[in-house]
From Swiss-Prot:
This is Ubiquitin-like protein 4A. InterPro entries: Ubiquitin-like_dom (IPR000626), Ubiquitin-like_domsf (IPR029071), Ubiquitin_CS (IPR019954), Ubiquitin_dom (IPR019956), Ubl4_C_TUGS (IPR041421), UBL4A-like (IPR047154), Ubl_UBL4A-like (IPR044724). GO terms for cellular component: BAT3 complex; cytosol; nucleus. It comes from Xenopus tropicalis. It comes from the Eukaryota. It is found in: Cytoplasm, Cytosol; Nucleus. The keyword Cytoplasm applies. The gene is ubl4a. Keywords: Cytoplasm, Nucleus, Transport. The keyword Transport applies. One of its GO terms (biological process) is tail-anchored membrane protein insertion into ER membrane. As part of a cytosolic protein quality control complex, the bag6/bat3 complex, maintains misfolded and hydrophobic patches-containing proteins in a soluble state and participates in their proper delivery to the endoplasmic reticulum or alternatively can promote their sorting to the proteasome where they undergo degradation. The bag6/bat3 complex is involved in the post-translational delivery of tail-anchored/type II transmembrane proteins to the endoplasmic reticulum membrane.
Length: 148
């Protein structure tokens, strides 16, 4: 089916998709057509933001539907690049070994997995991790559960 994707500031593209395609797959097509990186895209349908993991049928998007594209500007706050340095370094490494699109996909996956892993840490987990970092001489005992 044909969809029209319209950026809020002008550009428009027609793309060929199926109802079973995910929003992320659509974003990749939009990246090819409109040269907007997936990480900067937010797709809307009838005013509702679309989640990457859902398929188009989930939102009742059919032939001839029109999606709106909001482009998120990626501006780093002045004087604060510490957290982004590792991601930028990883991005450079990935781009040496993968196409730009694949490198972006891998980087997004790693970032999401990292955020998910952090959100699962309990206060006890953080305390054990800090103890291992600050007192490496106790790490063997901690690994064996003697300090728990």
């Amino acid at each position: 089916m044909q969809l029209t994707v319209k950026a809020l500031k002008g550009k428009e593209a027609n793309i060929q998709v199926s109802e079973g395609d995910t929003v992320l797959a659509v974003k990749r097509l939009v990246e090819e057509k409109l040269k907007v990186p997936v990480s900067q895209q937010r797709l809307l349908f009838r005013g509702k933001a679309l989640a990457d993991e859902h398929c188009l049928a989930h939102y009742s998007i059919g032939p001839g539907s029109r999606l709106n594209l909001m482009v998120k500007e990626q501006v780093a706050p002045e004087g604060h690049s510490g957290g982004n340095t590792a991601w930028k370094s990883l991005s450079v490494i990935l781009r040496k070994h993968f196409s730009p699109t694949d490198a972006e996909r891998v980087l997004e996956y790693v970032q999401k997995d990292y955020e998910r892993s952090l959100s699962l840490l309990s206060l006890d987990d953080i305390e054990r991790l800090a103890t291992r970092i600050l007192h490496p001489q106790y790490s063997e005992a901690t690994d064996l559960g003697f300090l728990d």
